[in-house]
Amino acid sequence: KIKWFKTMKSLAKFLAKEQMKKHLGE
């Protein structure tokens, strides 16, 4: 369960980074 939570956390971080890239690109 903890491993899954860790994965979700890193995934959220990755998505946030991608979102930032989109923001800066526009």
From Swiss-Prot:
Q: Name one GO biological process term.
A: killing of cells of another organism
Its annotated compartments are: Secreted; Target cell membrane
GO CC, sorted alphabetically, is: extracellular region; membrane; other organism cell membrane
Question: Where, by tissue, is this protein expressed?
Answer: Expressed by the venom gland.
| Major subcellular site | secreted
* Protein origin, superkingdom: Eukaryota
Q: Which UniProt keywords apply?
A: Antibiotic, Antimicrobial, Cytolysis, Hemolysis, Ion transport, Membrane, Neurotoxin, Secreted, Target cell membrane, Target membrane, Toxin, Transmembrane, Transport
**Which GO molecular-function terms appear in the entry?**
toxin activity
Protein family membership = Belongs to the cationic peptide 04 (cupiennin) family. 05 subfamily.
Per the entry, what this protein does is: Forms pore that permeabilize the cell membrane. Promotes efflux of calcium from synaptosomes, causes hemolysis, and dissipates voltage gradients across muscle membrane. Potently inhibits the growth of bacteria and yeast. May function both in the prey capture strategy as well as protection from infectious organisms arising from prey ingestion.
Report the protein name in the record.
M-lycotoxin-Ls2a
The lineage, from the top, is: Eukaryota, Metazoa, Ecdysozoa, Arthropoda, Chelicerata
